């Protein structure tokens, strides 16, 4: 990867493999650090002779075909190595054995273990544990397939983004031009590019003619950059004589020598940097892991306690082991895995409808816990198309609308000066609308030409009608295209107005250069001499527009006198035979890539949600700061150090940096900063703009934010954003303007490229976190009425009140739909007004949730179930005290004369029917108390009466679980299949008082929380 390999020293021997295969990880880290460094190359400093010596290329004939073939064999094809993709089967296994699924697998294995112990020791073992094991395995496999399918669907959409067009490149070999596949281009090749081509490799330009390239995907500059053979800057990314792989040539032609191909290009290094970064664990995965620890802890603690207890109570070892396994399995919430998966999927679908495509389900929640967003400027915060913002004519600044439909244009369009200015802007302009777009709105039409000229073309077309007709009336005779030495563009046209001279010369260019060529100025349609006062007015206007971060162009014209330039005069542009001085200055037009309409509002929402928005851009500081102020990243009244210095009229060095809330950091300063200095900036400034940053620096900024403990979202569209996208906790790429590399690296894609969609994402993410809490609280509560019957069965030696099969009916049957319905619950308060959650303290499942679900609501539910159990047995003659210690006889199939409290004798078959009826009734009681639990889980702080019952899915869930319970109880044949028996209608009502008690208890608890915020009740029970 070392960059300064002089190619003259590049003997094949130097390409030996790494000698030592040891320390592979260390090497990888070293490579990553190497990639994070700035680009170092020296080809831009070499003279043409030195280039010829280094690459052995004839500068007019190119390489020989034989030499090219040799180099191709040595270096490999000129293509980026695709990032290593995870094989599908590994992705599938991750779904099957990741996190929560492991808990269920362990449960299933324990069940099979228990069953095999029973099968080995009993003559007619019960099949409950076998069923349970099979069901648990099935649950994991089905939910695994489901989430795998969800993610595979997103990656299918990803595949469709890949543009499979094989690129062609025009090379010169053996002195002949030939078009070859771009992958066959080799180092040392002589390549020609013209407007509209993609640059096939990193080129050192040796000759150019009006060549401009669009580097925005690499550096983030929205303006096309001039390319010429001149060495203009030490930094290879800034110099004019290097053109980069995969950027686009927008106009002109150039010829260059290939200096790097494939992965060794600047673009290739960035792509490699992105694919080599490991993304960390998502916040929701960490939460689920934390939750599993809690549940496992509770399960093992209960299991071991009762294992010891059952040994003390003189059960056999085998029985005690069966109990241990039973308790651990009873603690596993079987339905929860499916619930969480479905909730995340629903949110992902909801986000897709709002133009956010989520690539992996866990990223859905990450956006909700985001505390810092690092956003790219070009194309994300702005529209990525230059638009005319202001004009200066008649000695005053006029505003053009920069809204996306340009509705704000309200200046005097009848002024003679404006007519002259618009005429120059339309004629001295090579941009044209592409064919067949007459029925599209002007601003939506595609233009062939560079960004500034397109902006002028659209502006003039909007204000003055068809530019094409204007150009036909004023036919062009000759032109001098823009070049970097004289910094102007000029053309001479036939003038159709008979009252004026025949030829009109129009010129545009850098304002100070244009003004130097003028001796008069047009004011209100009259020419006046250009005096010092007007020059000052020009200077002030120029500075004001430049200070707004706008790109300013000057315009002037001259009517060529007929006596010197009669009709048919031969104008010569090489040996100029017409005046290019003493022209008449007409005005200035300034352009900017304006903010998207919805962005300021979105930034405001982020700020009120406690999210810090940082702008990270490759563009110039002045432009970056202007846009940051325009969209509210630097808010009204907040000053940078430079602003304070200017206001107090003191040097910048005397200002205390802590006084400035806002801060604009230049990439070159960032280069020399230590991590500590960067941390200081991130800590002490609330509003930050990083300008002129390289891709490597974007990555360093993200790492800096993460060191502060922030959860970072990064938005971007260029290749230059991809390393940062990959490193961030959640990378957000742009769907329309985004490059393939950035889409690969991101976790989420904004299909409409609109920054405002991120706010929607944050809102959905926060909502799903709240709703998952509610869902989990609901699901866990029924664990207590499921476990306690088993514990009492062991301790008090009573007939088993609730069987394994019935537990499954609750977890995978009646509780599923209600738990999922909580995902549709609306937010209780304004989610977007609170601070982001602290991942260290604000957990998905915390001790308070467990204590509320298990210790409070769950206990009331268990009481309801036992009450029903004792009522049914008492109605059948077994009073509660008589049941103590009855278990051994009750479960013995050879004893057929067990007596009840009234002396009646019961056979084994009869006893079991009563027991199974009790199981069914206990099950129904749990359903009844879960009604109340579902309703109270709708809110965590508000009263249910404030929240209302608008959630239709939840109401459906209530009816669905009741209907399912009734079906399981009364459907003929259930006695055989699930050992469920029909109940007397009165037995349904046993648990009603407990259901009501739960509702009242929780409403009172929430009332106290609302009345006494921060009090004891809130600290102990608010999850």
Swiss-Prot record:
Q: In this UniProt entry, which cysteines form S-S bonds?
A: none
Query: How does this protein lie in the membrane?
Result: Multi-pass membrane protein
Annotated region Mediates interaction with SCN7A: where? Answer: 596-717
Subcellular location per the Swiss-Prot or TrEMBL entry: Cell membrane; Basolateral cell membrane; Cell membrane, Sarcolemma; Cell projection, Axon
Q: How is this protein annotated for GO cellular component?
A: axon; basolateral plasma membrane; melanosome; membrane; plasma membrane; sarcolemma; sodium:potassium-exchanging ATPase complex
Cytoplasmic topological domain? 6-87, 153-288, 339-772, 824-843, 939-951, 1007-1023
Question: GO molecular-function annotation terms?
Answer: ATP binding; ATP hydrolysis activity; metal ion binding; P-type sodium:potassium-exchanging transporter activity
Residues annotated as carrying N6-succinyllysine in the record are: 661
The EC designation for this entry is 7.2.2.13
Quote any Pfam family the record assigns. Answer: Cation_ATPase
Q: How does it assemble?
A: The sodium/potassium-transporting ATPase is composed of a catalytic alpha subunit, an auxiliary non-catalytic beta subunit and an additional regulatory subunit. Interacts with regulatory subunit FXYD1. Interacts with regulatory subunit FXYD3. Interacts with SIK1. Interacts with SLC35G1 and STIM1. Interacts with CLN3; this interaction regulates the sodium/potassium-transporting ATPase complex localization at the plasma membrane.
Instruction: Indicate what this protein is called per its UniProt record.
Output: Sodium/potassium-transporting ATPase subunit alpha-1
Gene giving rise to this polypeptide: ATP1A1
């Amino acid at each position: 990867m070392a960059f300064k390999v002089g190619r003259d020293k590049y003997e094949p021997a130097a390409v030996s493999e790494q000698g030592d295969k040891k320390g592979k990880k260390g090497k990888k880290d070293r490579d990553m650090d190497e990639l994070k460094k700035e680009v170092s190359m020296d080809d831009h400093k070499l003279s043409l002779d030195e280039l010829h010596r280094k690459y052995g290329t004839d500068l007019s004939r190119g390489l020989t075909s034989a030499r090219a073939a040799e180099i191709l064999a040595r270096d490999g094809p000129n293509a980026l190595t695709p990032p290593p993709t995870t094989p599908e089967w590994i992705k599938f296994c991750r779904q099957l054995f990741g996190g929560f699924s492991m808990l269920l697998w362990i449960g299933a294995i324990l069940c099979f273990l228990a069953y095999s112990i029973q099968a080995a020791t009993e003559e007619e073992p019960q099949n409950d544990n076998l069923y349970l094991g099979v069901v648990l395995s099935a649950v994991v496999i089905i939910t695994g397939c489901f989430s795998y399918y969800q993610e595979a669907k997103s990656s299918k959409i990803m595949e469709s983004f890949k543009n499979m067009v094989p690129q062609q490149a025009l090379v010169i070999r053996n002195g002949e031009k030939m078009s070859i596949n771009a992958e066959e281009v080799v180092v040392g090749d002589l390549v020609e590019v013209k407007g509209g081509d993609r640059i096939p490799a990193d080129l050192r330009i040796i000759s150019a003619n009006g060549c401009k390239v669009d580097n925005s995907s690499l550096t983030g500059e929205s303006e096309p950059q001039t390319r010429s053979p001149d060495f203009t800057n030490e930094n290879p990314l800034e110099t004019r004589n290097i053109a980069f792989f995969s950027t686009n040539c927008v106009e002109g032609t150039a010829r260059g020598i290939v200096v790097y191909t494939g992965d060794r290009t600047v673009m290739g290094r960035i792509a490699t940097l992105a694919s080599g970064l490991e993304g960390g664990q998502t916040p929701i995965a960490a939460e689920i892991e934390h939750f599993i620890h809690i549940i496992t802890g509770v399960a093992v603690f209960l299991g071991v306690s009762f294992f010891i207890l059952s040994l003390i109570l003189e059960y056999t070892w085998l029985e005690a082991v069966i109990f241990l396994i039973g308790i651990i399995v009873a603690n596993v919430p079987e339905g929860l895995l499916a619930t969480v998966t479905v909730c995340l999927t629903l949110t992902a679908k909801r986000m897709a409808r709002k133009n956010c495509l989520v690539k992996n389900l866990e990223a859905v929640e990450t956006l909700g816990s985001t505390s810092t967003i690092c956003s790219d400027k070009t194309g994300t915060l702005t529209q990525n198309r230059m638009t005319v913002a202001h004009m200066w004519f008649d000695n005053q600044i006029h505003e053009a609308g920069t809204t996306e439909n340009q509705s704000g244009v309200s200046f005097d369009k009848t002024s003679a000066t404006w007519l002259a200015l618009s005429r120059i802007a339309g004629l001295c302009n090579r941009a044209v609308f592409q064919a067949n777009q007459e029925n599209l709105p002007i601003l939506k039409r595609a233009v062939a030409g560079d960004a500034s000229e397109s902006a002028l073309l659209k502006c003039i077309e909007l204000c003055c009608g068809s530019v094409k007709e204007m150009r036909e009336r004023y036919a062009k005779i000759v032109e001098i295209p823009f070049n970097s030495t004289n910094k102007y563009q000029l053309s001479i046209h036939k003038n159709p107005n008979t009252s004026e001279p025949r030829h009109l010369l129009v010129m545009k260019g850098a304002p100070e250069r244009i003004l130097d060529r003028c001796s008069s100025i047009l004011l209100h349609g009259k020419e006046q001499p250009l005096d010092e006062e007007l020059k000052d007015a020009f200077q002030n206007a120029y500075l004001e527009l430049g200070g707004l971060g706008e790109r300013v162009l000057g315009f002037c014209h001259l009517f060529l006198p007929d006596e010197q330039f009669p009709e048919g005069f031969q104008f010569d542009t090489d040996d100029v035979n017409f005046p290019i001085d003493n022209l008449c200055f007409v005005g200035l037009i300034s352009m900017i890539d304006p903010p998207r309409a919805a962005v300021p509002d979105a930034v405001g929402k982020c700020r009120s949600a406690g999210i810090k928005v940082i702008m990270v851009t490759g563009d110039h500081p002045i432009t970056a700061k202007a846009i940051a102020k325009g969209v509210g990243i630097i808010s009204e009244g907040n000053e940078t150090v430079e602003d304070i210095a200017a206001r107090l009229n003191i040097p910048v060095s005397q200002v205390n940096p802590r006084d400035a809330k806002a801060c604009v950091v230049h990439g070159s300063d960032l280069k020399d900063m230590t991590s500590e200095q960067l941390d200081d900036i991130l800590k002490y400034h609330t509003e930050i703009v990083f300008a002129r940053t390289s891709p490597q620096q974007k990555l360093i900024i993200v790492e800096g934010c993460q060191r502060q403990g922030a959860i970072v979202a990064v938005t971007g569209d260029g290749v230059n954003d991809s390393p940062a996208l990959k490193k961030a906790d959640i990378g957000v790429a742009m769907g329309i303007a985004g490059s393939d590399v950035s889409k690969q690296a991101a976790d989420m894609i904004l299909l409409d490229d609109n920054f405002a969609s991120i706010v929607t994402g944050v809102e959905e993410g926060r909502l799903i976190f709240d709703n998952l809490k509610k869902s989990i609280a609901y699901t866990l509560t029924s664990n207590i009425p499921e476990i306690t019957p088993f514990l009492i069965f062991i301790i008090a030696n009573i007939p088993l009140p609730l069987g394994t099969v019935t537990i499954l009916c609750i977890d995978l049957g009646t509780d599923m739909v209600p738990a999922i319905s909580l995902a549709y619950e609306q937010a209780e308060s304004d989610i977007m007004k609170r601070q982001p959650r602290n991942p260290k303290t604000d957990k998905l499942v915390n001790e308070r949730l467990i204590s509320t679900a298990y210790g409070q609501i769950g206990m009331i539910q268990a009481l309801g179930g036992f009450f029903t159990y004792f009522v049914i047995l008492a109605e059948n003659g077994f009073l509660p005290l008589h049941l103590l210690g009855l278990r051994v006889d009750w479960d013995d199939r050879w004893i057929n004369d067990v007596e009840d409290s009234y002396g009646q004798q019961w056979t084994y078959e009869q006893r079991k029917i009563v027991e199974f009826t009790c199981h069914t009734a206990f099950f129904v009681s749990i359903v009844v108390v879960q009604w109340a639990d579902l309703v109270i889980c709708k809110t965590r702080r508000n009263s249910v009466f404030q929240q209302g019952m608008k959630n239709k899915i939840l109401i459906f869930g209530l009816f669905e679980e009741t209907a399912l319970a009734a079906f399981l109880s009364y459907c003929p044949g259930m006695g055989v299949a699930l050992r469920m028996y029909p109940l007397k209608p009165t037995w349904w009502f046993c648990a009603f008082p407990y259901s009501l008690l739960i509702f009242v208890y929780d409403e009172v608890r929430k009332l106290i929380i609302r009345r006494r915020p921060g009090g004891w009740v809130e600290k102990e029970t608010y999850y």
